[in-house]
């Protein structure tokens, strides 16, 4: 038995999926591949367990017409199995493998970028001062559109912030 067959027999598919944290389409494809592989192995073992020799002498003793048995034996001995060209299937598998590797590399890049962004955000959150300690100048420096919006509201004579009364209530005495 070759090393590849030995490794394939010992492969724990559930552990592979869980240890690589595969989800979605990749996990589904791997599971369906495992299912097809198991079915092919089962059929191979079933066919290998069947007897391959034919006892023609038994059929000659049972049947009256031995010519038929002779012809069948002649066909049986002259039969040569057809060799199948599997290069097309192998090229399809190689194409699938290369596509899977490309998808994995792309996913790895996306995950690495997302992790970098999340770490940066976490550092910003951890190093940020509490909101109640910020000054107006610091807010307008961080978000210049706030200053522009306030200036526009003052020009139009609006002194109320939309939604403020609904959220915090009206504190006017009148």
From Swiss-Prot:
GO terms for biological process, alphabetical: proton motive force-driven ATP synthesis
Cellular component, GO, one term: proton-transporting ATP synthase complex
InterPro entries: ATP_synth_F0_dsu_mt, ATP_synth_F0_dsu_sf_mt
Domain of life: Eukaryota
MF terms in GO: proton transmembrane transporter activity
Database matches in Gene3D superfamilies: 6.10.280.70
Pfam family, one: Mt_ATP-synt_D
Cell compartment(s), UniProt: Mitochondrion inner membrane
Keywords, sorted A to Z: Acetylation, ATP synthesis, CF(0), Hydrogen ion transport, Ion transport, Membrane, Mitochondrion, Mitochondrion inner membrane, Transport
Membrane topology annotation: Peripheral membrane protein
Cleaved signal peptide residues: none
Modified-residue entries (N-acetylserine), positions: 2
Family: Belongs to the ATPase d subunit family.
Function: Mitochondrial membrane ATP synthase (F(1)F(0) ATP synthase or Complex V) produces ATP from ADP in the presence of a proton gradient across the membrane which is generated by electron transport complexes of the respiratory chain. F-type ATPases consist of two structural domains, F(1) - containing the extramembraneous catalytic core, and F(0) - containing the membrane proton channel, linked together by a central stalk and a peripheral stalk. During catalysis, ATP synthesis in the catalytic domain of F(1) is coupled via a rotary mechanism of the central stalk subunits to proton translocation.
Descriptive protein name: ATP synthase subunit d, mitochondrial
Organism from which the protein derives: Kluyveromyces lactis (strain ATCC 8585 / CBS 2359 / DSM 70799 / NBRC 1267 / NRRL Y-1140 / WM37)
Origin organism lineage: Eukaryota, Fungi, Dikarya, Ascomycota, Saccharomycotina
